């Protein structure tokens, strides 16, 4: 996607965009010191003086992040009030959060996985044998791993889950590099347990990308996470389903011979053990090692652990309460420390965000457990909190919780792998490809899901459509975008005149929205407005890494914006150029990382800012509140698709340089246009594909006018995607008898404001034909 910044066209090759933002911010600060001198005391009537001295764009981003930090801290208290509520509905809500929603196929037997060259029997221990196995999860997805089968009757049945970067062979003692004391699958088998060890998707980046087009440095876990998130699924949910499919087989085996079922995991496997035990009461006890801690810093962990809305209701202790009264053994051990994603290289461009896993202080783990005072949770400390996973004390506690007499866990020599030509990467690649193919099939099926969602509305007439879509609008705002309370502090408008041109005056405007969070922008007021006259307004929205001044400064002619707010003001429209908070690269993208666990997104804040803006604009004596339109480019086009459809205060919306088949755009593994290949991880919206696409959002505006502005050379998407998606809008508006209210203009040009057909559309639809 083209980054929108006024400085981009004049930057020398290789110039860092961050420096561009810093340069523009420095220019703003210089202007901020000069403008008050030239226009002292010149404010819009009924407002207070504007005295903000910092860059309002970056100040806005920082204010939102501070708001999220406060909300994250406050969420701990709110979650505590939920403990003890009905576990059944809570489990179902948690199941949806992690995307473990697909129906598993029955598992009545494991399949031995072997050939004449690579036998299924992998190794033999003193009292058990090891087999390579697979078991079905969905019709098109299997789990694979190792079965450690005791020679006698199993004393217990355990799913032993390794960290993502450990193979099953590591836990079984068949691979070098891990201390024998940490090989807890082998040690459980030596104690007479039947143990099933699944393969997890690892953190390398070998297959993350589109071969022959572009490869990325996203881990395999992130690559699957990105596409799955849009379809309401998750890498975590997929792997929990694999664990629970193993439990399904154990339960089937228990019909013939009953034995208690447990789960034990380390690192990413510890997460899966906790989540699986929370969801399935057939699991009699769980051992979680190298994972359990406070989740208030979830946004600093790898993005593939991001869960939409998790901290609204759950943290590790809340999940422990879902395990209760069954036992949860928490082992404080050294976490599988992760410094970040794989390094980018010339062959693998950086697309992955930062995210770390670090071992927390032992005191913080103790305090997290003490906070809940849960009788079912037992803490075991390995090596002062930095020892190996699967200590004898932890394994003993697990077996005792399953009412199995604990073995001595005396040291034994590990078995020897009898396979001569085994390559674990082939198995891992097969598992990776299955989950990618499964997710892409869900994406292809999502159009039917969307049709089912929108079939709840009545499109027999315009009136019935408006009334019947209100619940759907609420669902989109609350469940997909994330809804904040309506602005709840006085607007306290502050203004300062910064332009005095022959045809208009310009004012900086700042409005309070929530405590500590403000809206900012530039208002252009034509001088031709007569006393008592009320004019139409066009809200002119900048794009990614942009500033309001780039749209509304009469002395600036950006290659992207072409002074469109100024040109419209010169025609007689009142214009307002809001500052949106998608600026500062990772500085703003962390809003998404911090917000998603709270069921909030960047657009949760943008919607509130525009609520306040519409309220304020509508109260100005020279504004006709019934004629306020929206016109946005690029990320401003994304705003055009998400804000006016939900806010009735906008009389129309124009999406420039962004409209396309959004589901394909965010999930495609075939197209160079795909966000799967870029660093824009801020585009992720949980379950978006099953609820809406851009045509659905445009149709939600009916019968308000809607228009698309599209340059043939725009690299956001191909014309064919744009035309395909807009055809649905045109057909729907025609069905409602208002085809003249849906338009598209194609022009020869790039990612830019064209300002020809759109200006005519504004004049017509806002009834400004002078």
Name these PLM-found stretches:
Residues 4-27:
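Bacterial N-terminal signal peptides that target proteins for export
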Residues 24-36:
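Bacterial N-terminal signal peptides
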Residues 41-143, 232-235, 281, 295-518, ...:
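Alpha/beta-hydrolase-fold serine-hydrolase catalytic core, especially in secreted/extracellular enzymes
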Residues 141-143, 150-158, 164-166, 516-519, ...:
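Proline/glycine-enriched tight loop/beta-turn segments at coil->beta junctions
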Residues 155-156, 191-193, 258-259, 281-285, ...:
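Loop/turn elements at helix/coil->beta-strand transitions in domains of secreted/extracellular proteins
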Residues 248-319, 615-672, 676:
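Primarily recognizes the serine-hydrolase "nucleophile elbow" in alpha/beta-hydrolase
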């Amino acid at each position: 996607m083209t980054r929108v910044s006024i400085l981009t066209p004049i930057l020398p090759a290789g110039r860092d965009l961050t420096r561009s933002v810093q340069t523009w911010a420095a220019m703003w600060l210089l202007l901020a010191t000069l403008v008050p001198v030239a226009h002292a005391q010149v404010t819009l009537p009924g407002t207070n003086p504007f005295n903000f001295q910092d860059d309002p764009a970056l100040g806005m981003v920082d204010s939102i992040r501070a708001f999220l930090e406060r909300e994250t801290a406050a969420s701990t208290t709110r979650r505590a009030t939920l403990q003890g509520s009905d576990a059944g509905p809570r489990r179902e809500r948690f199941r949806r959060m992690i995307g473990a929603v697909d129906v598993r196929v029955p598992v009545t037997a494991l399949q031995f996985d072997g050939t004449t060259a690579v036998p299924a029997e992998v190794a033999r221990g003193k009292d058990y044998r090891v087999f390579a196995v697979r078991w079905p999860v969905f019709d098109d997805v299997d789990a694979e791993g190792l079965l450690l089968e005791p020679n006698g009757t199993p004393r217990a049945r355990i799913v032993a889950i390794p960290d993502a970067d450990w193979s099953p062979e590591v836990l079984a003692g068949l691979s070098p590099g891990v201390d024998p004391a940490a090989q807890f699958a082998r040690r459980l088998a030596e104690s007479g347990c039947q143990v099933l060890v699944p393969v997890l998707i690892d953190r390398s980046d070998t297959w993350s990308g589109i071969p022959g087009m572009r490869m990325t440095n996203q881990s395999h876990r992130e690559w699957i996470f990105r596409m799955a998130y849009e379809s309401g699924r998750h890498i975590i949910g997929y792997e929990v389903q694999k664990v629970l499919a193993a439990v399904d087989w154990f339960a089937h085996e228990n019909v013939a011979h009953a034995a208690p079922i447990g789960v034990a995991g380390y690192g990413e496997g510890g997460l899966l053990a906790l989540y699986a035990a929370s969801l399935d009461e057939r699991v009699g006890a769980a051992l979680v090692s190298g994972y359990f801690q406070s989740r208030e810093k979830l946004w600093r962990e790898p993005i593939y652990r991001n869960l939409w809305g998790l901290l609204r209701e759950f943290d590790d202790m809340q999940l422990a309460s879902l395990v209760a009264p069954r036992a949860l053994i928490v082992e404080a051990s050294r976490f599988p420390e992760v410094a970040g994603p794989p390094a980018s290289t010339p062959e693998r461009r950086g697309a992955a965000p930062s995210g770390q896993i670090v071992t927390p202080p032992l005191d913080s783990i103790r305090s997290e457990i003490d906070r809940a005072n849960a009788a079912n949770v037992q803490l075991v400390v390995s090596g002062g909190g930095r020892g190996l996973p699967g200590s004898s004390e932890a394994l003993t506690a697990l077996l005792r919780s399953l009412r199995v007499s604990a073995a001595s866990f005396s040291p034994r020599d590990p078995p020897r792998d009898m396979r001569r030509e085994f390559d674990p990467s082939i198995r891992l690649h097969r598992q990776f490809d299955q989950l990618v193919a499964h997710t892409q099939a869900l994406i292809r099926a999502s159009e039917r899901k969307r049709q089912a969602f929108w079939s709840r509305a009545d499109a027999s007439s315009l009136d019935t459509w408006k009334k019947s879509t209100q619940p759907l609008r609420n669902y989109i705002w609350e469940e997909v975008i994330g809804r904040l309370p309506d602005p709840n502090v006085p607007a306290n408008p502050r203004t300062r005149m910064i332009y005095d041109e022959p045809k208009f005056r310009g004012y900086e405007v700042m409005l309070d929205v929530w405590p500590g969070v403000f809206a900012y922008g530039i208002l252009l007021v034509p001088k031709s407005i007569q006393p008592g006259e009320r004019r139409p307004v066009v809200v002119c929205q900048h794009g990614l890494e942009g500033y309001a001044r780039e749209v509304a400064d009469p002395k600036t002619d950006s290659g992207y914006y072409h002074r469109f707010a100024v040109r419209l003001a010169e025609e007689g429209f009142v214009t307002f150029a809001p500052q949106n908070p998608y600026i500062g690269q990772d500085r703003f993208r962390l809003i998404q990382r911090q917000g998603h666990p709270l069921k909030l997104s960047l657009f949760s804040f943008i919607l509130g800012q525009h609520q306040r803006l519409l309220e304020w604009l509508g109260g100005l004596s020279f504004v006709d509140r019934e004629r306020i339109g929206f016109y946005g480019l690029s990320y401003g086009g994304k705003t055009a698709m998400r804000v006016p459809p939900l806010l009735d205060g906008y009389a129309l919306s124009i999406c420039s340089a962004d409209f396309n088949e959004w589901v394909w755009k965010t999930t495609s593994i075939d197209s160079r246009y795909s966000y799967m290949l870029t660093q824009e991880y801020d585009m992720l919206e949980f379950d978006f594909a099953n609820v809406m696409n851009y045509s659905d959002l445009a149709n939600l505006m009916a019968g308000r006018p809607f228009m698309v502005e599209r340059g043939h050379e725009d690299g956001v998407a191909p014309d064919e995607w744009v035309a395909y998606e807009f055809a649905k809008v045109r057909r729907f508006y025609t069905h409602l008898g208002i085809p003249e209210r849906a338009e598209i203009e194609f022009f020869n040009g790039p990612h830019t404001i064209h300002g020809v057909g759109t200006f005519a559309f504004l004049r017509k639809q806002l009834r400004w034909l002078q």
